[in-house]
A protein has these predicted regions:
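Hydrophobic transmembrane alpha-helices and their membrane-interface caps
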Residues: 25-31, 36, 341-410, 469, ...
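Transmembrane alpha-helices and their membrane-interface boundaries in multi-pass membrane transporters
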Residues: 123, 394-408, 432-451, 458-498, ...
Length: 1016
């Protein structure tokens, strides 16, 4: 008994099992995590170092280089890249893909800890592995006209942050902006001098007066008491009454030399939202968190806490990743439903039977539900790649059902032998091998895709795994469930089906033309050679990119004001930028950070970013909005360097440390050469069409005031250089000498000189220092003050000095723009032979991805050839059939060119898949060819018999992919090039399979006596 017959005898149990899988898949869909991206551990560890404010050159020698050399010795490290600025350094340690990044991060921490004692005293570091969870999933702003920034900060930090951290899936909640409460002790220098006191003595007195410490235990009356000495300040006035000195003449109180005021910590940052000073709080998810559920939980928690939020405080969300995810889910749902309906129309038009249509269309939701169950078992998530994979698989899923149903209908209705059930059983049994072979042709394409690495593999493994799972499940449904349903629902009388008049006319035209072609089969090259030439022409002219660009509904604007610009002046420039944003009709809301970054890192006071959220559609395309904002800023805010990019592009760039599309790395040991050459290179490439936002890579820090202490003179005064440095720190930064507890927070008490007494170089020069013997002397007696221009950041790549000239692209594709940039550099001769240079950035990632996908394409072709050889044991048959998908690849290039679609990693995925899809259709034709009785008309008859099935599968797949190809809905842009590539290949597959394949088989002299290929 055949397996098909066995399946028919167990129809109820099989259908019940499939129904159970479907129900389980539906249930699993409610538990599957939802995220924007697949969970990917990028092979990059970021080490941030802080060593005070030492110059960049010294920082590079004393801190950066030792750490670089230490982490370079870790096994698996591929490259090390560093950026060193004044007092800080950031080192990117890149590992091979597939490394255990948790272990890699721990190794980096261990290596830095080993050498930490050898680094300058006070050096601190932070090690962070990069993954998509380093960016927030939802963020809010707090603004108010009636509450201070201190109150807003306390509300966010002490009320909202703890409550929101309890939401399931939340990793942490961070707070940016606002002011931190502090008591400021403003010391009058003249009064301090009159009492012969120093700032250090004031600070020591405050610290000693605010103490709570356990001094022992007392056992009395069968009880044990803890004895606590408590001299803490209880009231604001008690600070002023602190005793600084006690003499026989009386006591000196703090109020005698200083004024105490309620103030806030000094800050060199500024945070705004929609033009108002604001406090931002950002929610980060755990790696396995459900973004949509987290966002929903945060919103619900904020509603619960509404009564705890004071009147006059406005809470507004300025970023919500769940909106994009939800929109992508809805567009995927719509794309699937539209695709099913369009495919159903094709079935109904060709077969004219609503039951057939029902059977075929029911397979799609059943297969997708079972696929979701498999994703749940594999601990994957709903994201733009898995959702896109399911949407793209709809056409291929329904194809399996179509070919099985069409074969059953054609065979069962054209035979009078046996009852209806036996005819269906026989038809399904004879189609098992063709269905298995054709399904295998598509499924094995995804085998080499499992070996993808880099950014391509990180994102597209999820898509390929989803599609492969869908197709495997689809095969079993078409093989087992479809025949069972056909036997139960279809009317399979013995009346032979007659094609309608239109079909008869098509068959006649096909027969006439094929008879002429088969008499001279070499004539097929009159079609194939022009197709190859057109494909080559398209290959040379099709635009190329890296990843598809989709409208995410918001973008990031990074900015840098001129080096050394004060925070106040930077803020003034940015208020002009805010005015431009407020006048842009598409802008819904925005937030701004100065001295901070969206990811939470602290930067210089002249740098920062905006996040701009756009209104829902209808509106202008996001690229047009970004171009408009860029033009306005460049015209009205000169001197401000800006960079506009969407969040996904920024995220991928930060995760891979290559954020710019164009990056020209210049290597030389001569720093002066690099600093002279970089502006020339930037000027050269800025003249290339489409190149914008060109940056030299030379980022100088602000000016510095260097205080050179003379050790000999200090020693003569009875002091040491460290004491002078401490006195300067107290004078300029102040000294938080103690803290006062107020409810859940500790409020610092800072001893400081008033601003008007320390705002000039003369004030610093005249700073009075007290020697151990009590005499006072001015700083100028032992030190020299020198103003220094800011040193540029130092970049190194694998321990080599490097400057990276970067640029972005507007209105052009990546491939042609970089070609023009290379041509401009060669023709200008601007880079001397003594300087090594190479291209990095997203272009380098594109080339790495393309090389990998090219190998994948060749591997797919080899696997398809092996499958064909296994199925038919004939090199000639396998070779003839393999030529069909290869020629279809030329059609893919042509389709991309005609639709002006970028040739990127998504369209290359579609091109690889088309090899299997077209082979699948070719197998349908050849399986019919083999089964026909020997005759001279067999090539033509096979085409006529399979024509309906081939047209149905092609049209159904094309229409099912049409919503994706048209870019309907959010998130569809990611799969749009893939859909267009597959559709183009399917369009060309029709003439290739029905016309070119018979001619090639005839040309290869397939044995006509037995209807089988001659075995070599």
């Amino acid at each position: 008994m055949s397996f098909t017959a066995w399946a028919q005898s167990h129809a109820r149990s099989i259908l019940f099992f499939l129904a159970t899988l479907v129900v389980a898949g539906v249930v699993a869909s409610f538990s599957l995590p939802v995220a924007l991206f697949p969970h990917v551990s990028f092979p990059r560890v970021r080490i941030t170092l802080d060593a005070g404010d030492r110059p960049a050159e010294r920082m590079a020698v004393e801190v950066t280089t030792p750490v670089e050399e230490a982490v370079r010795a870790i096994p698996g490290v591929r490259s090390v890249r560093s950026t060193t600025s004044r007092g800080t350094a950031e080192i990117s340690v890149n590992f091979d893909w597939g490394e255990d990044m948790v272990a890699a991060m721990l190794q980096c921490q261990s290596q830095v800890n080993k050498i930490l004692p050898a680094l300058p005293v006070g050096t601190s570091f932070e090690v962070e592995r990069m993954d998509p969870t380093v960016f927030p999933v939802i963020a809010y702003s707090l603004t108010s006209d009636s509450h201070s920034l201190i109150e807003l900060h306390d509300l966010a930090f002490y009320t909202l942050r703890p409550a929101l951290s309890t939401v399931s899936g939340v990793a942490r909640v961070t707070v940016q902006g606002g002011r931190v409460e502090e008591y400021r002790v403003n010391v009058d220098p003249d009064k301090l001098q009159s009492f012969k006191l120093t700032l250090a003595e004031v600070a020591a007195a405050l610290s000693a007066s605010n103490v709570q410490v356990a001094v022992g235990r007392l056992e009395q009356y069968n009880k044990l008491y803890l004895v606590v000495s408590d001299t803490r300040f209880q009231k604001f006035e008690e600070i002023e009454r602190t005793v600084l000195r006690s003499t026989p003449d009386g006591v000196v109180l703090l109020e005698d030399v200083a004024q105490v005021e309620h103030s806030s910590e000094p800050q060199w940052i500024r945070v705004t939202a929609d033009g108002h000073d604001a406090v931002l709080f950002q929610v980060y998810q755990q790696p396995t968190g459900n973004t949509v559920e987290i966002a929903s939980g945060i919103k619900a928690k904020l509603r619960e806490m509404k009564k705890q939020i004071p009147d006059g405080v406005k809470i507004a969300d300025w970023y919500d990743q769940s909106d994009l995810i939800t929109a992508s889910e809805h567009s995927t749902r719509d794309a699937v439903l539209i695709g099913i309906v369009l495919a159903a129309i094709v079935l109904l038009a060709f077969l004219g039977d609503w039951k057939v249509t029902l059977i075929a269309t029911l397979t799609v939701p059943a297969v997708l539900a079972a696929t979701i169950l498999l994703l749940y078992v594999l601990k994957m998530s709903f994201n733009i790649m898995t959702l896109g994979g399911m949407a793209a698989a709809v056409g291929l899923i329904i194809d399996d059902a179509i070919v099985m149903v069409e074969h059953i209908v054609r065979r069962a209705r054209g035979s009078a032998e046996g009852d209806a059930r036996s005819r269906v059983l026989r038809a399904a049994s004879e189609f098992t091998n063709p269905l298995a072979g054709s399904s295998a042709a598509t499924i094995i394409i995804f085998t080499p895709l499992a070996f993808l690495s880099g950014v391509t593999g990180a994102f597209f493994k999820a898509l390929s795994l989803t599609m492969a799972a869908s197709l495997i499940i689809s095969f079993f449904v078409a093989w087992l469930a479809v025949p069972i349903l056909c036997a139960s629902l279809l009317r399979t009388d013995s009346k032979i089906e007659r094609p309608n008049s239109f079909a008869q006319r098509v068959h006649e035209v096909y027969r006439e033309n094929m008879q002429r072609l088969l008499r001279r089969p070499r004539g097929v090259f009159l079609f194939l050679i022009p197709l190859l030439l057109l494909g080559f022409l398209a290959f040379k002219n099709v635009p190329s990119g890296f990843m598809p660009v989709m409208d995410e509904g918001g973008f990031i604007l990074d900015y840098i004001s001129p080096p050394g610009t004060s925070l106040a002046e930077t803020d003034r420039l940015l208020r002009q930028v805010e005015s431009i944003l407020q006048e842009t009709p598409e802008v819904q809301t925005y937030s701004r950070r100065t001295g901070l970054q969206l990811g939470g890192g602290v930067t210089e006071a002249n740098t920062g970013d905006f996040f701009i959220r756009l209104k829902p559609f209808p509106r202008r395309n996001i690229e047009e909005v970004m171009d408009g904002v860029r033009e306005e800023i460049e015209q009205h805010v000169p001197g401000l360097q800006i960079e506009l990019l969407q969040l996904m592009e920024d995220l991928i760039g930060d995760l891979t440390s290559v954020p710019q599309p164009i990056e020209i790395k210049l290597y030389s040991d001569d720093e002066a050469t690099l600093h002279t050459l970089a502006p020339k290179v930037a000027d050269t490439i800025s003249k290339v069409k489409g190149v914008i936002e060109v940056k030299t890579g030379i980022i100088p820090a602000g000016d510095a005031l260097n205080i050179q202490v003379d050790r000999v003179k200090v020693a003569l005064e009875g002091m040491d250089p460290d004491a002078v440095t401490k006195a300067l720190d107290d004078f300029l930064t102040g000294n938080v000498t103690t803290k006062i507890q107020q409810g859940p927070k500790l409020v610092g008490v800072r001893v400081w000189i008033p601003r008007d007494a320390r705002e000039t170089m003369r004030n610093i020069d005249n700073l009075l220092l007290r020697a151990p013997d009590g005499h006072l002397f001015p700083l100028r007696r032992v030190a020299t003050l020198t103003a220094l221009s800011g040193q540029p950041e130092i970049m190194r790549d694998d321990l080599k000095r490097m400057v990276a000239v970067t640029a972005r692209i507007s209105g052009r594709d990546l491939g042609s723009t970089v070609r023009d940039v290379k041509r401009a550099l060669v023709h200008s001769g601007v880079i001397p032979n003594s300087v090594l240079y190479r291209f990095g950035g997203l272009y380098e990632q594109q080339q790495i991805a393309f090389r990998g996908l090219t190998l994948i394409l060749f591997a797919a072709i080899v696997l398809v050839f092996l499958l064909l050889l296994f199925l038919y044991e004939s090199f000639r048959v396998a070779g003839a059939m393999l030529l069909i998908p290869i020629f279809a690849v030329a059609g893919v290039y042509l389709g991309l060119w005609l639709t002006r679609t970028e040739f990127n990693i998504t369209s290359r995925m579609g091109m690889t898949m088309i090899v299997g899809i077209v082979t699948e259709i070719a197998i349908f034709y050849y399986s019919e060819f083999r089964d026909l009785p020997p005759s001279d008309d067999r090539f033509i008859l096979a085409g006529i018999n399979r024509m309906r099935a081939i047209f149905m599968t092609a049209f159904a797949a094309i229409l099912a992919l049409l919503p994706l190809a048209l870019g309907i809905g959010h998130g569809s842009a990611m799969q749009q090039p893939l859909a267009i590539a597959i559709i183009a290949g399917l369009v060309f597959s029709l003439p290739l399979v029905l016309i070119a394949l018979p001619a090639l088989l005839a040309l290869f002299k397939i044995d006509t006596a037995t209807g089988a290929a001659q075995r070599e």
